[in-house]
């Protein structure tokens, strides 16, 4: 297996929204790599997007890699995912080194680059909350 890529130019991410618009991050971002056939992922969605006011420096997205766009669109609708926060990825999953879902990936933006800060497997809701709080604390101290 190739060594994971840790820096990306925006154009190299290969991400797009469900409506096919390309994705260009304006801030640091958090990606939750998920799958349409992942029961743990389903349990996380509502918690992942809750409490955003307290984490306003973060930008959260759910990323589906290697999934058919219509399947992702249908899944997003049935799970009430905000369409502007759902992204489709080509091989970004593999390039970052994500090996299972759900995995949360933290990327810091600087100029025209995103830098991989951390990637963690999320086994459940309590783990998700813990990692989001840690990121919020680091962002508040400008340490993310």
Stretch-by-stretch model annotation:
Residues 105-143:
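Non-catalytic, surface beta->alpha helical segment in thiol-disulfide oxidoreductase systems
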Residues 57-73, 81-89:
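Thiol-based oxidoreductase modules, predominantly thioredoxin-like and allied folds used
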Residues 1-21:
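N-terminal "domain-start" segment that seeds a small globular fold
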Residues 27-28, 43-65:
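Conserved helix-turn-beta segment immediately C-terminal to the redox Cys motif
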Residues 10-12, 84-90, 123:
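Short acidic-hydrophobic, aromatic-tinged amphipathic segments that line or gate anion-handling sites
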Residues 78-108:
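Short, internal strand/loop/helix patches
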Residues 48-51, 72-76:
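Hydrophobic packing residues within well-ordered alpha-helices of enzyme cores
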Residues 20-42, 48:
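Short active-site neighborhood of thiol/selenol oxidoreductases, capturing the structured segment around
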